[in-house]
Amino acid sequence: KEEQMKTELSSLVSDKNVAKKYQKEYKELVEKIQDFDYEVKDEKVDGDAATVKVQITTYNFGTAYKEMYQQVVKDANSGKLTSKTDLNDYIYKMMFKKMNALKKKDYKKTVSIQCTKNEDGDWETDVDTNSDLKDAMLGGIMTLSSQNSTSSK
């Protein structure tokens, strides 16, 4: 699942050079994202299908993202950002600074994971396609980023 989380983070960091330029900060953020706790709250099994409710506890990346977004808007409106500002660099510096500064795991979200038994009798999950689970593991950042993109239209 480490590769999956790196892929999720990479989708947030779309510039190929960012991971290289901010290698230390990028690595720190990946490790922070992987540092989540979980607790199985409930499970319901019905033959070859099951639903497991899991509470994820992690860092509040969503709030850090929202604060970063608000700061970018404020700086743009105040004239701090000019045509000479490298916006990507400005945003990535702020993103890594805000997210890597998080110290407490105070974000909690309970999600449902769908499971099915395969022909070998092993359980498989929907974790690869479960956007609620990804959002929980990313501390609500997907929810808040979609709210920001909707509200800025």
Regions of interest found by a model, annotated:
Residues 75-87, 101-149:
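Short beta-strand edge/turn micro-motifs at domain boundaries
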Residues 47-49, 145, 151-153:
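Hydrophobic membrane-targeting and insertion signals
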Residues 45-49, 119-120:
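Residue-level signal for tight coil/turn positions that link beta-strands
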Residues 1-39, 63:
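Core segments of small alpha/beta cavity-forming domains
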Residues 57-72, 103:
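Short, cysteine-centered beta-strand-loop-beta hairpins and adjacent loop/turn segments enriched
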Residues 39-44, 51:
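Proteostasis/folding factors centered on peptidyl-prolyl cis-trans isomerases
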Residues 23-30, 88-104:
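Intrinsically disordered, low-complexity acidic Ser/Thr-rich regulatory segments
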Residues 48-58:
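A short hydrophobic beta-strand element
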